[in-house]
C-alpha cells in the first residue's frame, strides 16, 4: 500500500499552523495575520492589495478580511491609490514594528523547536523534495 503522503503533508501543515496560532494567541494574532504582515514587510513599500494577495498566493477577497482585522488592530493603514481609485495601498503603522518583532521571535523560536533533532543537511534535503513536489504539481496544474 502506498504512503498517504498528501494526507501526511496536509496534517503536518495543519498542526504546525495550529501551534503557531496557539503561540500567537497572547499577541491576539494568528498565523494568517503573521503571513500577511511578513509579506507586507518583504514587499516594496505601499504595495496594493492585489500585489499582496499574489505574493501570499490567495485571492484578493480572501485577503480583505485579514487586512480589516489588521487595520482594526492599528497595525496597517490602507489608502486609495492616486492613479487607480479602485486600488488600495497598504502601509504598516509605527505601532506594528514592535508587534512584528515579537511575532518574528515567536515564529523563529517555534521553528527551531519544531526542527529540533533534524540537522541542516536533512532540512536542505527536505526543502529540495518540497521544491520538486511543488514544481511537479504546478506543471500538472498548468497542463489542465
From Swiss-Prot:
It holds the Pfam family MarR. Residues 2-135 form the HTH marR-type domain. NCBIfam families: PRK03573.1 (NF002926). Residues 49-72 bind DNA. Transcription regulator that can specifically activate or repress expression of target genes. GO terms for biological process: response to stress. Keywords: Activator, DNA-binding, Repressor, Transcription, Transcription regulation. Homodimer. InterPro entries: HTH_MarR-typ, MarR/SlyA-like, Tscrpt_reg_MarR-type_CS, Tscrpt_reg_SlyA, WH-like_DNA-bd_sf, WH_DNA-bd_sf. Belongs to the SlyA family. GO terms for molecular function: DNA binding; DNA-binding transcription factor activity. PROSITE patterns: HTH_MARR_1, HTH_MARR_2. Coiled coil: none annotated. It comes from Wigglesworthia glossinidia brevipalpis. The keyword Transcription applies. PANTHER family: TRANSCRIPTIONAL REGULATOR SLYA (PTHR33164:SF64), TRANSCRIPTIONAL REGULATOR, MARR FAMILY (PTHR33164). This is Transcriptional regulator SlyA. Gene3D superfamilies: Winged helix-like DNA-binding domain superfamily/Winged helix DNA-binding domain (1.10.10.10). The keyword Transport does not apply.
Amino acid at each position: 500500500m502506498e504512503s498517504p503522503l498528501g494526507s501526511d503533508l496536509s496534517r503536518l501543515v495543519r498542526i504546525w499552523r495550529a501551534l503557531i496560532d496557539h503561540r500567537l494567541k497572547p499577541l491576539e494574532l494568528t498565523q494568517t495575520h503573521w503571513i500577511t504582515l511578513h509579506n507586507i514587510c518583504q514587499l516594496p513599500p505601499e504595495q496594493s492589495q492585489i500585489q499582496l494577495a499574489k505574493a501570499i498566493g490567495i485571492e484578493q477577497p480572501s485577503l480583505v478580511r485579514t487586512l480589516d482585522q489588521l487595520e482594526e488592530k492599528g497595525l496597517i493603514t490602507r489608502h486609495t491609490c492616486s492613479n487607480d481609485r479602485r486600488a488600495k495601498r497598504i502601509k504598516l503603522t509605527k505601532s506594528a514594528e514592535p508587534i512584528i518583532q515579537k511575532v518574528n521571535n515567536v515564529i523563529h523560536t517555534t521553528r527551531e523547536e519544531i526542527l529540533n533533532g533534524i540537522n541542516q543537511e536533512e532540512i536542505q534535503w527536505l526543502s529540495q523534495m518540497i521544491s520538486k513536489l511543488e514544481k511537479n504539481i504546478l506543471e500538472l496544474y498548468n497542463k489542465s
